[in-house]
Amino acid sequence: MQYHDQFDVIVVGGGHAGTEAATAAARMGMKTLLLTHNIETLGHMSCNPAIGGIGKGHLVKEVDAMGGIMAQAIDHAGIQFRILNSSKGPAVRATRAQADRLLYKQTIRHTLENYPNLQLFQQACDDLILEGDRVCGVVTQAGIRILSKTVVLTAGTFLNGLIHIGMEHYRGGRSGDPASVTLAERMREMPLRVGRLKTGTPPRIDARSVDFSQLQMQLGDDPVPVFSYLGKPEQHPRQVPCFITHTNVQTHDVIRANLDRSPMYAGVIEGIGPRYCPSIEDKIMRFADKDAHQIFIEPEGLTTHELYPNGISTSLPFDVQVQIVRSMKGFANAHIARPGYAIEYDFFDPRDLKPNMENKCLQNLFFAGQINGTTGYEEAAAQGMLAGINAALRAQDKDPWAPRRDQAYIGVLMDDLSTLGTKEPYRMFTSRAEYRLLLREDNADLRLTPVGRELGLVNDERWAFFNHKLEMMAQEQQRLQDTWIQPQHPATEGLNKILKTPLSRPASLEDLLRRPEVNYQDLMAIEGVGPGIEHPQASEQIEIQVKYAGYIDRQQDEIDKQLRHEETLLPLDLDYSEVPGLSKEVCIKLNDTKPQTIGQASRISGVTPAAISILLVHLKKRGLLRKSA
């Protein structure tokens, strides 16, 4: 049965990757179809009810800078906002928000249902339509064939999903949703490298059964931050506290006594779990010297009693889960509303992807999200947007786009995945970015909004807002440079109160702001100096640019040197075993990965600088030295 319409882009899956992929393609004017097995679960938070965090918040800001929907959704659904690492340098500061799970899902669905160029269709995808090595559509569970110029696959944990609670297991994409078995088996017949990963989630607790007087309260920040560059605090719903408790010796004894009933330790689960979000069983075994682990008690929403105990993800049997929960302070009489579980699922080796997220073997097919071996809503959203952008470009026969490592965390993410691959669920951290001083949360718009506008992702409202901010910053930066304070100036008395050493010679406001003990707000509060600009994001960027100018310039110099050969293209049909001088090990790794650029090749483990020099000489001799567009 043929569907009555054809599309430029079909997105399979309505999670965090799928929704960003679909909206990105639609913003670029593409006729887009979002295919989901259940419209009711669009934007559903399968695990923790939160957005952001170290490295993750940076990704959300980058998606927002290019017009994505995640940041604006959490601004309308966030019930607690905090800036993490607020006392540290600007490179590692990150926004994190607790979400009302239901409100977030409702916001995403409302956004999608009212998005121009985007249609929703509730059908599971069972197959891809192929013409040779080219994908040209999908086949649904009901046998409906839908044609499209490109397909973006964002199936999350649904491909051959297997849920484990103790020794019991059953098929599922997540709790309450069916696994995608037919599509998974069909994908295994294609020329794709497939592996298994696992992730898990903790039991949910009924708040009415918890003694909060025994817990430590954790409040959000005041003033309340926003996530989107267009966000306003008044968009936030009512703010609520989180709480903290700890595991203890009794908890750990219960877990150790029941490890033989853990599917992970009994060898039932084959997939590798996330290193940086381990199960409570893993924590107890890996950190055997610790008598306690901190557990964050997070509300699931304003209209539910469910709590999310962040830190006790487990696949132990239900009776053991009850013992674990009730051993913690404040939880002696706790009622578990939903048991925790682990889920195994298929993923595809991301080294089989080009940097633009298109599969190397199958044209017009793009992968995004957990099927690429990542973990986390934010990593999925970033990949989804990039895949949606490039599916739209491919549908228009335009050149692909992928950010470099020095341009965006999205670039770091995709370069790591497509070059190095992953054997465990990949999570973003600021430590993964060598140029993190330039890739801050505060300047994601400066880095990516102009690119987004050029690609057709940024609408007039966002573009006008961005340019107004640039104007304000330019005018204020000029004022700071041109305004000088003399030692005898009336403002000096107030100024000396915040300076470590009194002002003894003329200084510009920019010079004063460069001092570590002076911040922009304090400087503007001095009579005769202010009022300055009230836009908090603009003033923050001005202060960072002034204080860190030397470090930023030095890092930019490093980037300029690195870029000399970073984008030199490598022929995809190059047989590295025929390049004289390369070791057998290097040849195997290069032939296995097929890097697209010298930059990618240089980041493959075992490929030495000497090997890169040999490659460059080989390319030059054969007249193959050329840069990517």
Curated annotation (Swiss-Prot):
Q: Give the family from UniProt.
A: Belongs to the MnmG family.
Q: Which GO terms describe its biological process?
A: tRNA methylation; tRNA wobble uridine modification
**Alphabetically ordered keywords of this record:** Cytoplasm, FAD, Flavoprotein, NAD, tRNA processing
Q: Which InterPro entries match?
A: FAD/NAD-bd_sf, GIDA_C_N, MnmG, MnmG-rel, MnmG-rel_CS, MnmG_C, MnmG_C_subdom, MnmG_C_subdom_sf
Q: Which positions in this protein are listed as binding NAD(+)?
A: 273-287
**Which cofactor is essential here?**
FAD
Residues that hold FAD according to the record: G13, G14, G15, H16, A17, G18
Q: Where is the protein localized?
A: Cytoplasm
Residues annotated as signal peptide: none
Q: What does this protein do?
A: NAD-binding protein involved in the addition of a carboxymethylaminomethyl (cmnm) group at the wobble position (U34) of certain tRNAs, forming tRNA-cmnm(5)s(2)U34.
Q: What is this protein called?
A: tRNA uridine 5-carboxymethylaminomethyl modification enzyme MnmG
Which organism is this protein's natural source?
Answer: Tolumonas auensis (strain DSM 9187 / NBRC 110442 / TA 4)
The UniProt entry, under NCBIfam families, shows:
mnmG_gidA
* Gene giving rise to this polypeptide: mnmG
Subunit structure as annotated in this protein's UniProt entry: Homodimer. Heterotetramer of two MnmE and two MnmG subunits.
UniProt feature coiled coil, ranges: none
The cross-references to SUPFAM superfamilies, in alphabetical order and at most eight, read: FAD/NAD(P)-binding domain (SSF51905)
User: Where would you say this protein principally sits, based on its record?
Assistant: cytoplasm
Q: Which GO terms describe its molecular function?
A: flavin adenine dinucleotide binding
Q: Which is a Gene Ontology cellular component entry for this protein?
A: cytosol
